[in-house]
Amino acid sequence: MEKLEFDHIGLITNEKKGNEVWVEKTRVWVTDFAHHPYRAEWLRYEPDSPVKGPVREKPHVAFRTSNLEKASKGMKVLLEPFDVGFAIVGFYESDDGAVIEFMRYKKEVE
């Protein structure tokens, strides 16, 4: 298995949170998990977001990896990898139904 490092947890909300940032590709407002004491990222989807199913309905756990393809081998693809500026991210579903985000950062981060 590809080496993984915990990055953050993503939680769905319908409430506006402070310091939200807009992600046009997925039409979602997100908070910066790096500024949360427990690395929680809040996601607030717009009604017309193209994101459907488990990614939009369930919390997710995100891991850093150097290779999304190797890390996600054998997993169901929920959202194909895309560029969010600072990283390439993709969403997958584990055998037991957990939503997993794999992230390949473009630069080293703490």
Predicted regions and their residues:
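Vicinal oxygen chelate
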Residues: M1-H35, A40-G53, K76-E110
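Short hydrophobic/aromatic beta-strand micro-patches
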Residues: G10-I12, A62-S66
